[in-house]
């Protein structure tokens, strides 16, 4: 299972002051995703391949063991759609985490499953 996370959408789903430090908020999300790489997510047992898609002010977030970071040159949604298409071409099941309805429509056209931000925010993010 490939878990593709729309970082901007997931970080923005909780009004916790993320707008003051987008990179820091995205790094906290990245760190929380490490557990999902080992344990799995939303009915999909681990291990899973976790891909965090970043853009804008969070483009410089570095990967960590268990979480691959993909920085979008332009639209994060376009990159997520491309990654979902690659997963389909590779025959890899894919779950995209976002609340963005249009993005959900685009990735399901590639056969991806979708889940909301709560799927990966079940635990408090590290501070």
Regions flagged by a language model, labelled:
Residues 2-4, 11-127:
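Nuclease catalytic cores that cleave nucleic-acid phosphodiester bonds
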């Amino acid at each position: 299972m490939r878990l593709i996370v729309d970082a901007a959408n997931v970080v923005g789903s909780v009004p916790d002051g993320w707008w003051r430090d987008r990179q820091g908020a995205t790094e906290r999300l990245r760190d929380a995703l490490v557990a999902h790489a080992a344990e799995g997510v939303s009915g999909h047992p681990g291990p899973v391949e976790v891909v965090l898609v970043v853009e804008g002010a969070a483009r410089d977030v570095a990967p960590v063991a268990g979480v691959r970071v993909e920085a979008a040159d332009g639209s994060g949604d376009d990159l997520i759609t491309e990654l979902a298409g690659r997963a389909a071409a590779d025959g890899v099941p894919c779950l995209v985490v976002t609340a963005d309805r249009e993005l959900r429509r685009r990735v399901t056209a590639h056969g991806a499953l979708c889940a909301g931000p709560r799927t990966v925010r079940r635990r408090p993010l590290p501070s």
